[in-house]
Structures are given as structure tokens and as C-alpha cells.
Amino acid sequence: MKPYRLSRRAKADLDDIWTYSEQRWGVEQAADYARELQATIEMIAEHPGMGQPDENLRAGYRRCASGSHVVFYRVGVRVEIIRVLHQSMNARAHLG
């Protein structure tokens, strides 16, 4: 597994996802969804090429869907998780 790092924005995204999920569906569902997102991030670190390249967004960026969200990342010496955005969000506006 490659080491990985969450950007400050990715950490904030995950916190916001937790808060929304907890308020909307309760603690148990929020915890389940958080585990699903974490498992996706760990899978990306284990298999960095699994995500789809998103060169139109930014050079070197990749994307991988997880539930209703998309994990945006890039691969170098380590995997950098850049953002975790809802699939309905305009990624270009949030990553541009």
C-alpha cells in the first residue's frame, strides 16, 4: 500500500459528510458511510491506478466513486486525497 495523505479540504469534506449524514440518517448510518468512504480511500492507496484519470479537470488528477461521493486524488510518492465531493457537485468549481 502506498502511503496516503488527506488534504485539509478532504478532511473538511469528510467532516461535513459525517455531519450531514448524522443529521439526516443518524449516527449508525453516518458511521457506516464513513467506513465505506475510508475503505475506498484505503483501496485507492493500495491500488492507485484503479480510479479514472480526469486530465480534463487537472493534470494528474484521478477520480473514484464511493457511494454518492467521488474521491479526487493524485499519485506521486504517496497518494494525495484532494477532495471528497458529492457526485452532483460541479467538480471543476471546487477543484479549479
UniProtKB/Swiss-Prot annotation:
Annotated knockout phenotype: No visible phenotype when deleted singly or as the parDE1 operon.
InterPro entries: ParE1/4 (IPR028344), RelE/ParE_toxin (IPR007712), RelE/ParE_toxin_dom_sf (IPR035093), TA_system_RelE-like_toxin (IPR051803)
Keywords: Toxin-antitoxin system
GO biological process, one term: protein heterotetramerization
Function: Toxic component of a type II toxin-antitoxin (TA) system. Its toxic effect is neutralized by coexpression with cognate antitoxin ParD1 but no other ParD or RelB antitoxin. Low levels of wild-type toxin in the absence of antitoxin decreases the rate of cell growth, and results in death or loss of colony formation abilities and greatly elongated cells. Low levels of a mutant missing the last 4 residues leads to loss of cell division while cell elongation continues.
PANTHER family assigned: TOXIN PARE1 (PTHR33755:SF9), TOXIN PARE1-RELATED (PTHR33755)
Subunit: Forms a ParD1(2)-ParE1(2) heterotetramer.
Similarity remark: Belongs to the RelE toxin family.
Name the UniProt record assigns to this protein: Toxin ParE1
Species assigned in the record: Caulobacter vibrioides (strain ATCC 19089 / CIP 103742 / CB 15)
